[in-house]
């Protein structure tokens, strides 16, 4: 037998082999390495059975929930994408699940007010980043108790910070923005603030008052940066996040929503970003921009051709580029170096005066 031939190496070798076999579990039972590929995230909210069918174990789900990659609607009912682009159908489904979970938790905690991301969803503001447990706020002095599936915050809740939205008692938009900035960081705070300013949900005065009220609370630095960075000219979360990338990289501040015309006065387009001193246009292309018939795509190509004939360089990017924005920044820097400077005869464009001033 083959086994008999292996025994010739001596009893000690056989003993080591048996010991090694006992210590090493069979391949099917080995713990997966951290670098092992994880099952695909669900394309829509599903229950735990559906997640199991995709290859998710209970342990993997616990880790994903803790990391904010998926969100639970409570009682193991709903799971969904947490990292989808703001405004996308997947993201909206997850946001609705988060709001429903907050509502369910609020029923079990009568003094609680829906706050943070769930309050943003209730008032229509976009969210970015991981969506994990729903957040509720209770008045200062309330004894906190463990509430399964929810994150309770104890804080001052004056009447001016409370509104009703979709039938729920939630924190006001200005208070919600400051809470999000303090809890989830500047990126999430600025995206919500830009939208709220653009849509008239808040004024700069509202944001300033909300900041002053929480100026001594944890996270106040993020809240202050959010207040100073917010710009109601942004028309999408992608524009908000792109603007923050420009600032972090030290790029000159662009002119947002510039109305560009040809030198003869023909209207061309309103650009997302214009660096007029360099002759560069930046276009942040969001989700579902092109219709099935392709007509929008044709118009985009025609507009780009007009901009280029006027002497402008067009740089475009999308949501996927946010994962690593360095290549976009490099393309912009290259365009700045090649662009048409003021006074050049190649400069064949002008800027129309804005008809709408954003707060």
Please give the residue ranges for each predicted region:
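Surface segments flanking catalytic/ligand-binding clefts of nucleic-acid enzymes
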Residues: 10, 16, 20-31, 39-42, ...
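Short gly/ser-rich loop at a beta-strand->alpha-helix junction or flexible surface loop bordering the NTP-binding
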Residues: 1-219, 337-359
């Amino acid at each position: 037998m083959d086994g008999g031939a292996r025994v010739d190496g001596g009893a000690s070798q056989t003993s080591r082999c048996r010991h090694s076999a006992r210590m090493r579990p069979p391949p099917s039972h080995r713990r997966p390495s951290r670098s092992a590929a994880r099952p695909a995230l669900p394309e829509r909210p599903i229950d735990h059975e559906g997640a199991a069918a995709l290859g998710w174990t209970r342990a993997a789900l616990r880790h994903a929930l803790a990391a904010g990659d998926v969100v639970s609607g409570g009682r193991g009912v709903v799971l969904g994408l947490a990292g989808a682009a703001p405004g996308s159908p997947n993201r909206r489904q997850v946001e609705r699940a988060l709001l429903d979970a907050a509502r369910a938790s609020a029923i079990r905690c009568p003094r609680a007010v829906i706050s943070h991301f769930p309050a943003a969803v209730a008032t229509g503001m976009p969210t970015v980043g991981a969506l994990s447990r729903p957040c509720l706020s209770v008045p200062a002095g309330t004894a906190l108790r463990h509430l399964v599936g929810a994150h309770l915050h104890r804080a001052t809740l004056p009447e001016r910070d409370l509104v009703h939205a979709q039938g729920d008692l939630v924190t006001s938009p200005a208070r919600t923005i400051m809470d999000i900035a303090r809890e989830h960081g500047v990126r999430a705070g600025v995206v919500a603030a830009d939208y709220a300013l653009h849509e008239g949900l808040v004024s700069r005065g509202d944001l300033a008052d909300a900041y002053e009220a929480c100026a001594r609370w944890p996270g106040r630095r993020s809240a202050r940066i959010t207040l100073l960075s917010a710009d109601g000219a942004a028309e999408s979360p992608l524009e908000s996040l792109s603007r923050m990338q420009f600032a972090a990289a030290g790029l000159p501040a662009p002119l947002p929503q510039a109305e560009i015309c040809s030198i003869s006065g023909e209207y061309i387009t309103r650009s997302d970003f214009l660096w007029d001193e360099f002759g560069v246009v930046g276009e942040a292309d969001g989700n579902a921009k092109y219709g099935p018939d392709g007509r929008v795509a044709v118009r985009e190509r025609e507009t780009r051709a007009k901009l280029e004939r006027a002497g402008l360089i067009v740089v475009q990017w999308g949501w996927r580029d946010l994962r690593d924005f360095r290549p976009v920044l490099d393309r912009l820097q290259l365009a700045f170096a090649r662009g048409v400077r003021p006074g050049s005869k190649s400069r064949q464009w002008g800027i129309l005066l804005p008809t709408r001033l954003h707060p």
